[in-house]
């Protein structure tokens, strides 16, 4: 019974973290150009996760791309710098993006 209760509590915490990160992406206007499962202006989060799967340095590089912007990795439209996003928020967002399957 304790294991069942622990599983329920932990799954709730994981779900809350996932929803919190999706809410953060919406609040920081990431969803204006990106979506979880389909390409908009920028790549889908699932495509980003697939491209960087197994890349140990991806989290750090993508955190900097969120903060400073970038170009060339996904086509001709550059990603602008996101001055409204703190480094901690960028890291949270990147971890969430990389967790998409």
Per-segment meaning from a language model:
Residues 4-13:
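Sec-dependent N-terminal signal peptides
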Residues 14-20:
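Sec/Tat signal peptide C-region and signal peptidase I cleavage site
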Residues 22-24:
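Immediate flanking context of iron-sulfur cluster ligation sites
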Residues 26, 35-65:
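Gly/Gly-Pro-rich "capping" loops immediately C-terminal to redox-active cysteine motifs
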Residues 29-36, 93:
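The canonical Cys-X-X-Cys-His
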Residues 41-50, 65-94:
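Axial heme c-ligation environment in periplasmic c-type cytochrome domains
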């Amino acid at each position: 019974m304790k294991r069942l209760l622990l599983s329920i509590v932990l799954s709730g915490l994981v779900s809350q973290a996932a929803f919190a990160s999706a809410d953060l992406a919406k609040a920081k206007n990431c969803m204006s150009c990106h979506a979880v499962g389909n390409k908009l202006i920028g790549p889908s989060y699932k495509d980003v996760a697939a491209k960087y799967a197994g890349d140990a340095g991806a989290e750090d590089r993508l955190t900097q791309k969120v903060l400073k912007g970038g170009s060339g990795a996904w086509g001709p439209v550059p990603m602008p710098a996101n001055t409204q996003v703190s480094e901690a928020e960028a890291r949270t967002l990147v971890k969430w993006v990389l967790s998409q399957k």
